[in-house]
A protein has these predicted regions:
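N-terminal Rossmann-like NAD(P)+-binding subdomain of aldehyde/semialdehyde dehydrogenases
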Residues: 1-148
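Conserved small-residue-rich beta-alpha loop and adjacent elements
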Residues: 42, 129-212
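Short beta->alpha linker loops
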Residues: 53, 105, 115-119, 193-197, ...
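Short acidic active-site motifs
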Residues: 148, 225-226
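Glycine-rich beta-to-alpha transition loops that act as phosphate-gripper elements at the mouths
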Residues: 163-164, 219-224, 242-244, 266-268
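Hydrophobic/aromatic ligand-binding patch that stacks against planar heteroaromatic rings
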Residues: 178-181, 229, 255
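Short hydrophobic alpha-helical runs that function as membrane-insertion/retention elements
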Residues: 187-190, 217-219, 238-240
Length: 304
């Protein structure tokens, strides 16, 4: 067959810019409001436009997380571990893209950005390994004075609202999201407001991995609009307020208390600006898994 040669390009090629969307129920919708906001580097250079999620978008995300909760919690612990490990595998294949987005958003050099991305991948692997060990480590067979067996079994809390760390757009997010998922919870995440791009790319990894739609739902936008609604939503069972600023912490905790939510927050005296997410002793802990588990105690008569 003859070879067909394409003619010289008449005009310079225009780059295809990426559209950063929300992630709700396994799909990538734009905000129902049609709004967006500009994401820039720390130096003020424009990077992209991100969707500015609305209250309705958040309600849709909570609804999707609730629908996905029971099937996700019913999966075997080993299977959840395999799925989280698969996330690490796919992140490894897109490492260069994550490095570029972390470097641009956080103002890091290529070396430090690569370190943050590789630590994020390793963190998925670390938490995946905990999936089938939670029952043995956190559960117990309790001694009782009577003809009964008494067992304590960890169970997932339900739908967890997660306000991601603002400064560490990828490693901080993974460090808070992975312990929520490994225990069988589903999540509604409000990404870093100023540095949301790596989080959106992470959802593209989740969508192409084995994580079922609705298990993770991620919103970008203004925290002043989204966080109070998340904290007060009656169908959210727990909230992680790590990314909430000190000025807003009391208000968020009061809203969470109205609907009796389980609450996880930064330890007192710990600043999000100074916390070292690369510190394996401080930033990956089984206690962070336990924060979103409830302990169910079962009594059973001996011989029955």
């Amino acid at each position: 067959m003859p070879t067909v040669r394409l003619g010289a390009r008449a005009t310079p090629r225009i780059d295809v810019r990426k559209t950063y969307k929300l992630y709700i129920g396994g799909s990538f919708p734009r905000s129902e409001s049609g709004r967006s906001y500009l994401v820039s580097t720390p130096g003020g250079e424009a990077l992209a436009n991100a969707c500015r999620a609305s209250k309705k978008d958040l309600r849709d995300a909570v609804r999707a997380a609730r629908k996905a909760f029971e099937p996700w919690a019913a999966r075997s612990a080993m299977n959840r571990g395999q799925i989280l490990y698969r996330v690490a595998e796919l992140m490894e294949g897109r490492r260069d893209q994550f490095v570029a987005e972390v470097a641009g958003g956080e103002g890091l050099g290529p070396g430090r950005a690569r370190d943050a991305v590789e630590a994020s991948i390793d963190r998925w692997v670390w938490y995946a390994g905990w999936a089938d060990k939670l029952g043995q480590v956190l559960g117990n067979s309790n001694p009782v004075a009577g003809s009964f067996f008494n067992f304590t079994i960890p169970e997932p809390t339900g739908v967890v609202g997660l306000v991601a760390p603002e400064r560490s757009s990828l490693l901080g997010l993974v460090s808070r999201l992975a312990p929520v998922l490994v225990g069988g919870n589903t999540a509604v995440v409000i990404a870093s407001q100023g540095r949301p791009l790596p989080a959106v790319t992470l959802t593209e990894v989740l969508a192409t991995s084995d994580v079922p739609g609705g298990v993770v739902n991620l919103l970008t936008g203004l925290r002043t609009e989204l966080v109070p609604v998340l904290a007060g939503h009656v169908d959210v069972d727990a909230i992680d307020t790590w990314g909430v600023g000190p000025d807003d912490q009391r208000e968020v905790e009061a809203a969470a208390a109205d609907s009796i939510k389980r609450l996880a927050r930064r330890p007192r005296g710990v600043s999000d600006e100074r916390f070292d997410w690369a510190d394996e002793r401080a930033a990956q802990r089984p206690e962070w898994i336990a924060a979103f588990l409830e302990m169910k105690t079962v009594w059973h008569p001996i011989g029955a």
